[in-house]
């Protein structure tokens, strides 16, 4: 950072307008182990507790079957979109915020919104204060990601337009079945609603495509934590980047304060071979979460679905 912000450093200086830093969210900025991702726990809660009357029995079965280590694939994301069909964007945003106030059983004294890794939040602030523009590039749906970020320690450093995520289909209310949005116009007081349709899951190559489409410049810093982030990492450190660039990977190797499952030696060697700089949660994070938050005795807690 000192080198790229020094105008006297002709070889490495990066103008402010080009200081782009991109962060994955789940597992990079935030917890993904209570007992799974924020958006997935929200889906489970919506289907099985908060609004079971709004969803099909099929979606309830999908929600009830989710366990730690499940695959967060496009099929599941499509089910998320189906569950929230008919909600306005304001209603959906508000529900994502409301859900964050609930407590997880996978950690003690932790609401879902208390999910930010404090060292990563400090890093976001540090980069922002040194002229970097911060983007969150998440596999979580875009509006949900915005709700999380807006109620987090990084809310002052990441604006809603700097959040890129998975996209559900959204239509103007009353025109959900009209194939083309070119066939009608928005008027004062109209609502935008989730149709249940799905556009794109923001993982793997879609991350680099979305960055190109929505930012239009290569980042100079990228932070991730899994294979689904490697396209974003590689796009950042591509040899055609006109500026010096680095990519970092968070390794979930802390088994005391977190539900870590990764081996540091194995993952660090893998990442270094790919040109990424590994970050150890166990060794590099002096504190992970806020005061009083500790790992619970068990990660997964079965639900009583008798009702």
Question: Model regions: which residues?
Answer:
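Non-catalytic pre-domain segments flanking phosphatase-related domains
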Residues: 1-25, 33-34, 47, 52
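Mixed-charge, polar/low-complexity N-terminal
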Residues: 2-5, 9-11, 65, 195-196, ...
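Residue-level detector of functional hotspots within protein domains
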Residues: 6-9, 13-15, 73, 78, ...
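C-terminal cap/substrate-recognition subdomain and adjoining C-terminal extension
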Residues: 13, 18, 94-135, 139-307
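A metal-dependent, Asp-based hydrolase signature
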Residues: 34-35, 40-114, 118
């Amino acid at each position: 950072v000192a080198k790229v912000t020094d105008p006297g450093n002709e070889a490495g200086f990066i103008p402010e307008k080009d200081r782009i830093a991109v962060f994955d969210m789940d597992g990079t900025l935030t917890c993904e182990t209570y007992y799974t991702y924020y958006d997935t726990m929200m889906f489970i809660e919506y289907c099985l507790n908060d609004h079971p009357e709004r969803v099909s029995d099929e979606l309830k079965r999908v929600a009830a079957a989710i366990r730690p280590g499940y695959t967060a694939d496009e099929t599941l994301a499509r089910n998320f979109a189906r569950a929230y069909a008919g909600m306005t964007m304001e209603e959906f945003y508000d529900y994502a915020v409301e859900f964050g106030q609930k407590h997880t059983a996978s950690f003690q004294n932790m609401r879902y919104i208390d999910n930010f890794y404090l060292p990563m939040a400090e890093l976001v602030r540090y980069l922002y204060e040194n002229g970097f523009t911060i983007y969150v590039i998440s596999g979580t749906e875009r509006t949900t990601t915005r709700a999380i970020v807006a109620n987090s320690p990084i809310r002052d450093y990441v604006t809603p337009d700097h959040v890129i995520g998975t996209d559900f289909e959204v239509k103007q209310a009353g025109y959900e079945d009209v194939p083309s949005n070119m066939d009608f116009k928005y008027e004062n007081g109209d609502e935008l609603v989730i149709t249940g349709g799905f556009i794109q899951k923001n993982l793997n190559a879609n991350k680099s495509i979305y960055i190109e489409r929505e930012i239009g410049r290569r980042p100079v810093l990228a932070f991730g934590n899994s294979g689904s982030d490697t396209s974003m990492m590689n796009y950042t450190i591509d040899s055609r980047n006109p500026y010096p660039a680095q990519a970092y990977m968070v390794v979930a190797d802390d088994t005391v304060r977190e539900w870590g499952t990764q081996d540091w030696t194995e993952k660090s060697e893998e990442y270094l071979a790919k040109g990424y700089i590994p970050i150890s949660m166990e060794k590099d994070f002096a504190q992970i979460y806020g005061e009083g938050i500790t790992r619970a005795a068990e990660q997964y807690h079965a639900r009583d679905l008798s009702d």
